[in-house]
């Protein structure tokens, strides 16, 4: 769709996924710090691991995690992604088409699938797991709130340097937060980079993600506080998580 749209308009366009990925990675790293997890010793499961956001997260985390498990609908596509990631000589790369089997032993889950309904049974997730759900609609059911022993948060959200009002409800918890994809367009304009920056699956390199993260920080766009739905995950909630979770 990106290529079709680009051919129909005379202005640069971007999916916004590079900055979304940057905020996902920042969220995972911060959650690891809060939960006392060592990312270098962790198994990371990426639901929707062959998609644009999922594959970009995998490329960056391949240099930070111990094991990465990619899930997807098509085994052939998964095998291609596995081969590309394995060539980076980083984390061990595994693949599966079964989401619930994959999450059983996960230390960290990045849920980035395109799905109309939740794709993971939260009862399969072990205590102490960090879950970053960047899917819209959400990959993880909001009924997961009954699991006070797992750290589930909405991924890909950014702060804004000034309250953001589009005149209608964006479904965000407060006006000081914006979707990462929206933020990317604003950041690129502020940097005067009028180009097709994020342009489709497989083209989001770790270098591009890092550049937009630093440009965003320069202009006041950084990782948003942790939320799940409209509920802020505050220090008290994190203390409860730590008391109930098995931390590795």
Feature roles, as predicted:
Residues 7, 11, 17-29, 42-43, ...:
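N-terminal Rossmann-like NAD(P) cofactor-binding subdomain of oxidoreductases
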Residues 1-40, 166-175, 179, 183, ...:
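Glycine/serine-rich phosphate-binding loop and adjoining beta1-alpha1 elements at the start
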Residues 30-108:
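Glycine-rich phosphate/diphosphate-binding loop of Rossmann-like nucleotide-binding domains
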Residues 142-248:
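Adenosine-phosphate binding glycine-rich loop
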Residues 1-7, 80-87, 143-145:
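Short, aromatic/basic amphipathic alpha-helical patches
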């Amino acid at each position: 769709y990106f290529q079709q749209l680009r051919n129909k308009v005379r202005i640069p366009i971007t999916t916004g996924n590079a900055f979304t990925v940057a905020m996902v990675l920042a969220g995972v790293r911060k959650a690891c710090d809060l939960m006392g997890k060592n990312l270098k010793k962790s198994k990371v499961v990426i639901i929707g691991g062959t998609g644009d956001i999922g594959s970009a997260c995998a490329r960056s985390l391949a240099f930070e995690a111990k094991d990465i498990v990619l899930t997807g609908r098509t085994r052939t596509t998964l095998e291609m992604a596995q081969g590309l990631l394995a060539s980076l000589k980083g984390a061990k790369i595994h693949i599966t088409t079964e989401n619930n089997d994959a999450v059983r032993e996960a230390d960290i889950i990045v849920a980035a699938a395109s799905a109309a309904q939740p794709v993971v049974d939260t009862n399969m997730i072990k205590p102490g797991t960090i879950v970053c759900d960047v899917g819209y609609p959400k990959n993880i059911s909001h009924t997961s709130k009954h699991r006070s022993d797992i750290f589930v948060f909405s991924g890909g959200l950014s702060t804004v340097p000034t309250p953001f009002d589009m005149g209608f409800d964006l479904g965000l918890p407060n006006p000081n937060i914006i979707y990462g994809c929206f933020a990317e367009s604003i950041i690129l304009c502020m940097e005067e980079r009028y180009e097709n920056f994020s342009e489709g699956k497989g083209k989001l390199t770790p270098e591009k993600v890092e550049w937009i993260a630093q440009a965003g920080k320069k202009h006041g766009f950084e990782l948003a506080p942790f939320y799940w739905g409209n509920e802020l995950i505050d220090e008290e909630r994190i203390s409860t998580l730590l008391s109930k979770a098995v931390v590795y």
